[in-house]
């Protein structure tokens, strides 16, 4: 996109950017430039994890996941664990198949740099309280990455309200 002055290329770029604006309005993102198109959530989660791994995470840092994560939100962090000697902690599910915020809070340590969680579990149907988790995390300068594959088609999304750092 934006690679030519030919009228067809300009028309394609305009359509592409109009789509970005439509998505921005639909999910109430602050700015259309926050919208990054990928082939899917797996690619998006890999992109975020790899970028954070290269630019932000260091040996000894910790990442917090939950026991409900889909493989696509586990594997990229697992690779970082191996390549950068980063620790992964897991917040446990309760007997109802949910993850109370207390289970997340008790797993946060001073070394926690990223919380990577799903919005809605495709295993139990549990909806995680993303806004509350983000508030807790941001108070401790922790980045929040949300796997929204199940949440996006089933929940009304408001990125400004959720305030997470990345939503795939």
Where are these regions (language model features)?
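Pyridoxal 5′-phosphate
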Residues: 1-168
């Amino acid at each position: 996109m934006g690679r030519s002055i030919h009228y067809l290329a300009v028309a394609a770029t305009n359509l592409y950017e109009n789509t970005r604006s439509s998505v921005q309005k639909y999910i109430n993102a602050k700015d259309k430039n926050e919208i990054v198109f990928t082939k899917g959530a797996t690619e998006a989660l890999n992109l975020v994890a790899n970028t954070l791994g290269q630019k932000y995470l260091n040996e000894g840092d910790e990442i917090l996941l939950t026991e409900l994560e889909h493989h696509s939100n586990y594997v990229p962090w697992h690779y970082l664990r191996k390549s950068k000697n980063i620790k992964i902690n897991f917040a446990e599910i309760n007997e109802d198949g949910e993850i109370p915020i207390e289970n997340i809070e008790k797993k946060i340590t001073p070394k926690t740099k990223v919380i990577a969680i799903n919005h809605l579990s495709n295993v139990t149907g549990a909806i995680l309280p993303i806004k509350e988790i983000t508030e807790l995390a941001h108070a401790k300068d922790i980045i929040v990455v949300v796997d929204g594959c199940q949440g996006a088609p089933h929940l009304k999304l408001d990125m400004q309200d959720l305030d997470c750092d990345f939503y795939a």
